[in-house]
Amino acid sequence: MIASVRGEVIDIALDHAVIEAAGVGYKVMATPSTLATLRRGTEARLITAMIVREDSMTLYGFVDGDARDLFLTLLGVSGVGPKIALATLAVYDPQALRQALADGDVTALTRVPGIGKRGAERMVLELRDKIGPVSAGGGAAVGGHAIRGPVVEALVGLGFAAKQAEEATDKVLANDPEATTSSALRAALSMLGKK
């Protein structure tokens, strides 16, 4: 399978990037924070997981192997598919997710779009012993104004001026301080599209 993709970033969208490698453009699904690290026209390398279904083959890209491994571990949970696994990593970085699972924090896990209380309880039950160690420093969920940087970077990567991106992001976060990276990015794009 395809374990990584390296090449020129041809396009960046809300939920994916297209990376051209050896003359082939690979559509790679990724979290907003991963997409924020990419710049159109520059070379990039993403660690990938290839998910093959009866009717599709989809690449999911990550900044590092740790995030990819956690994504694959999440897929082992009953009822969790690639979209929910990716949404989980969009809301929580790997360290924060490990901490929530280790603490059995069902409430934190229900903040992920598509995960209800039962799904969160199932995740904790099935993954508590499978996840890697949690460092002493712990991790923080992506939330509030901690997501400002990744959202602004993603907007700039999509071609908006830095000042426009910052203003739109600040307005979105003022209206919804609990917004996730992906919801803030969507709202900012919607706001910028109306101008």
From Swiss-Prot:
InterPro entries: DNA_helicase_Holl-junc_RuvA_I, Hlx-hairpin-Hlx_DNA-bd_motif, NA-bd_OB-fold, RuvA, RuvA_2-like, RuvA_C, RuvA_C_sf
Keywords: Cytoplasm, DNA damage, DNA recombination, DNA repair, DNA-binding
CC terms in the record's Gene Ontology section: cytoplasm; Holliday junction helicase complex; Holliday junction resolvase complex
A Pfam family of this chain: RuvA_N
DNA-binding as UniProt keyword: yes
Record's subcellular location: Cytoplasm
CDD domains recorded: UBA_RuvA_C (cd14332)
Biological function: The RuvA-RuvB-RuvC complex processes Holliday junction (HJ) DNA during genetic recombination and DNA repair, while the RuvA-RuvB complex plays an important role in the rescue of blocked DNA replication forks via replication fork reversal (RFR). RuvA specifically binds to HJ cruciform DNA, conferring on it an open structure. The RuvB hexamer acts as an ATP-dependent pump, pulling dsDNA into and through the RuvAB complex. HJ branch migration allows RuvC to scan DNA until it finds its consensus sequence, where it cleaves and resolves the cruciform DNA.
Region Domain III, residue ranges: 150-195
Family classification: Belongs to the RuvA family.
Oligomer status and interactors: Homotetramer. Forms an RuvA(8)-RuvB(12)-Holliday junction (HJ) complex. HJ DNA is sandwiched between 2 RuvA tetramers; dsDNA enters through RuvA and exits via RuvB. An RuvB hexamer assembles on each DNA strand where it exits the tetramer. Each RuvB hexamer is contacted by two RuvA subunits (via domain III) on 2 adjacent RuvB subunits; this complex drives branch migration. In the full resolvosome a probable DNA-RuvA(4)-RuvB(12)-RuvC(2) complex forms which resolves the HJ.
The protein, known as: Holliday junction branch migration complex subunit RuvA
A Gene Ontology biological process term: DNA recombination
Region (Domain II): 64-142
Organism: Mycolicibacterium smegmatis (strain ATCC 700084 / mc(2)155) (Mycobacterium smegmatis)
Region (Flexible linker): 143-150
One Gene Ontology molecular-function label: four-way junction helicase activity
Keyword DNA damage: yes
Domain notes from UniProt: Has three domains with a flexible linker between the domains II and III and assumes an 'L' shape. Domain III is highly mobile and contacts RuvB.
UniProt-listed HAMAP family: DNA_HJ_migration_RuvA
Signal peptide coordinates: none
Main localization (coarse): cytoplasm
Region (Domain I): 1-63
